[in-house]
């Protein structure tokens, strides 16, 4: 069956209905983050709910639902984009020599400088301290920089890793 991505808005209706998880933001499985994103929804909703003392009216709930969506949507849209990007990366680039060199350098940088460098994949998958959007922006910038330096011959697989990191 076909795979799809859901990016809808609003996620709520008149203070009595709220979409969460795949109902609000289904994503293709190419990052393996769908369930994690849904669990993050629940944590964020709980945090917002605790900040509002005993909501009792539809207006109270509408305020909560609006706050929840405004904090989550940028991250759920980002993981949806990242999952599609990862599909294309796996489909089109795994045999590309430049991509393979980039991946080799990323792995070496992460291993040698774990406190200073984290690849896009690791930012998304293993770093709970930043949201998907921040991970996407930082990861894309790193990918672009490494690919450009490789393509322009500024670095190669034999380059000193400290110098690569400093660039």
Where does each model-flagged region fall?
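C-terminal helical "tail/cap" subdomain of flavin- and related membrane-associated enzymes
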Residues: 47-167
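FAD/FMN-dependent oxidoreductases across multiple families
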Residues: 1-60
């Amino acid at each position: 069956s076909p795979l799809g991505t859901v990016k809808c808005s609003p996620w709520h209706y008149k203070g009595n209905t709220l979409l969460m998880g795949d109902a609000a933001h289904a994503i293709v499985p190419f990052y393996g983050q769908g369930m994690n994103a849904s669990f993050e929804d629940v944590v964020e909703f709980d945090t917002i709910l605790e900040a509002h003392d005993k909501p009792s009216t539809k207006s109270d709930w509408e305020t909560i639902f609006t706050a929840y969506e405004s904090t989550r949507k940028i991250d759920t849209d980002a993981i949806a984009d990242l999952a599609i990007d990862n599909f294309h990366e796996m489909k089109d680039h795994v045999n590309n020599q430049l991509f393979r060199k980039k991946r080799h350098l990323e792995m070496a940088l992460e291993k040698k400088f774990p406190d200073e460098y984290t690849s896009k994949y690791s930012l998304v998958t293993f770093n709970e301290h930043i949201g998907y959007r921040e991970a996407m922006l930082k990861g894309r910038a790193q990918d672009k920089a490494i690919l450009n330096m490789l393509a322009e011959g500024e670095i190669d697989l034999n380059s000193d890793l400290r110098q690569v990191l400093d660039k």
